[in-house]
């Protein structure tokens, strides 16, 4: 596949942004892993592993007796993942270059799976979920973080440039065959694949400028605006304004983050 097929790109700036994003969300991710029962000796599939920030966390959790199968179609991201694993001394990660729609992952070998902000982008999310269900052992658990209402992302009061960027995000994802609010369909799809819903949690935050989580959408706007210009959605001048919109908000400003659903299901 071409690295250009990624709506958000696979360049160094995107790797850096994904690292920041993972650091912001890491406490909630680790809590989800704990509640899903992921522990030493487990076999876990990371579906759409990207540069491997969650995969390396999982590898440390499951330990030498466990295994992490990191599935990712971008060779660029896998190179970053493998280098990170070497640097951390983690020999229990198998990094596999694979389109998570086109090929299955294996049958009945995984104690758990992890998937974050992937289903919004893939051509056939139902098929991907079928692969997840097939890979799990009986009793295995699937953990997902997916958007359920992207339009909750608002500044207080609303900022026209943030609103404009949000609409462009939805358009670019839609044009590439994706759906922003894929989390709304997720519980029904999992049930149809024979999985039992264990827990659904809403993950949404109201933060002030200067809060660590503020950096998550701010960094997305900075890199995403440039990517939109590269793809021809905006002119360079508008991209520059959109990139710094959250940085230019007054001190003490408030923001609501996009609504993410955490779904844990059991086979």
Regions found by a protein language model. Name each.
Residues 3-25:
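Class I SAM-dependent methyltransferase Rossmann-like catalytic core
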Residues 23-42, 57:
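Conserved alpha-helix/loop element of class I SAM-dependent methyltransferases that forms part
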Residues 45-47, 51-103:
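Class I SAM-dependent methyltransferase SAM/SAH-binding core
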Residues 104-112:
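A short acidic, Gly/Pro-enriched loop at the edge of an enzyme's catalytic core
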Residues 111-126:
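A short SAM/SAH-binding and catalytic strip from SAM-dependent methyltransferases
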Residues 126-141:
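A short glycine-rich, Lys/Arg-flanked "PGG" loop and its adjoining helix->strand segment in the class I
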Residues 143-211:
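Conserved catalytic/acceptor-binding region of the Class I
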Residues 180-181, 191, 198-267:
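Conserved Class I S-adenosyl-L-methionine
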């Amino acid at each position: 596949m071409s690295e250009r097929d990624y709506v958000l790109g696979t360049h160094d700036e995107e790797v850096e942004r994904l690292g920041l994003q993972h650091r912001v969300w890491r406490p909630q991710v680790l809590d989800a892993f704990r509640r899903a029962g992921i522990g030493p000796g487990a076999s876990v599939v990371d579906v759409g592993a990207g540069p491997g920030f969650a995969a390396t966390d999982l590898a440390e959790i499951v330990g030498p007796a466990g295994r992490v199968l990191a599935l990712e179609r971008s060779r660029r991201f896998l190179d970053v993942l493998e280098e990170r694993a070497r640097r951390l001394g983690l020999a229990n990660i198998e990094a596999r270059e694979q389109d998570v729609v086109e090929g299955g992952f294996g049958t009945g070998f995984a104690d758990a799976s992890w998937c974050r902000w992937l289903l919004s982008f893939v051509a056939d999310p139902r098929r991907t979920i079928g692969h997840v269900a097939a890979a799990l052992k009986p009793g295995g658990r699937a953990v997902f973080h997916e958007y359920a209402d992207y339009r909750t992302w608002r500044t207080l009061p609303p900022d026209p440039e943030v609103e404009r960027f949000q609409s462009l995000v939805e358009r670019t994802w839609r044009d590439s065959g994706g759906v922003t609010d894929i989390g709304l369909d997720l519980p029904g799809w999992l049930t149809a694949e024979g999985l039992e819903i264990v827990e659904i949690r809403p993950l949404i935050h109201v933060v002030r400028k200067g809060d660590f989580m503020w950096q998550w959408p701010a960094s997305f706007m900075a890199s995403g605006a440039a990517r939109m210009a590269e793809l021809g959605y905006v002119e360079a001048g508008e991209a520059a304004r959109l990139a710094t919109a959250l940085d230019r908000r007054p001190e003490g400003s408030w923001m609501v983050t996009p609504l993410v659903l955490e779904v844990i299901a059991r086979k």
